[in-house]
Amino acid sequence: MTRLAEILDQMSAVLNDLKTVMDQEQQHLSMGQINGSQLQWITEQKSSLLATLDYLEQLRRKEPNTANSVDISQRWQEITVKTQQLRQMNQHNGWLLEGQIERNQQALEMLKPHQEPTLYGANGQTSTTHRGGKKISI
C-alpha cells in the first residue's frame, strides 16, 4: 500500500468518526432540552477531528499525484461522497441550532417584562427598585 493510500484511508476513518459525532450532535439538538456541557464536548470533538483531517489533507497534498491509479481514485471518490454527506448534515445541524437559539431568545423576551430593573443607588452600588411598597429605614 502506498503512503497516499494510507493517508486516504486515515482520512476516511476520521470522516467516519466525524459522522458519529455529528449524529450525536443532531440527536442532542433534536431533544429540545440542551445540555450545555454535552454540546461543548461535541463541539470540541468536532474541532479535534477537523484539525486531524486538515493535517491529513496537508500530508496528502505533499504526496505525488497518482491520479491514474484506480485504487487511489476509488478511495478519493469515497472521501468526496462522505464529505458531501457531512456538509449536508452540518447544514441540518446548523438549522437545528438556530431553531434552539431562537426558542431561547423567545423565552428570554417573555421573561424580560417580569425582571426587576437594576439601578445604581447614591452609593454607586446596584439596587433593585421595590414595587408597590415603601422602604423604611431607621
UniProtKB/Swiss-Prot annotation:
GO cellular component labels: cytoplasm
BP GO annotations: bacterial-type flagellum assembly
Subcellular location: Cytoplasm
Primary site of residence: cytoplasm
Keyword terms: Bacterial flagellum biogenesis, Cytoplasm
Annotated region described as Disordered, given as residue ranges: 117-138
Record has Chaperone as a keyword: no
Record InterPro entries: FlgN-like, FlgN-like_sf
Similarity annotation: Belongs to the FlgN family.
Biological function: Required for the efficient initiation of filament assembly.
Stated name of the protein: Flagella synthesis protein FlgN
Organism from which the protein derives: Escherichia coli (strain K12)
Gene: flgN
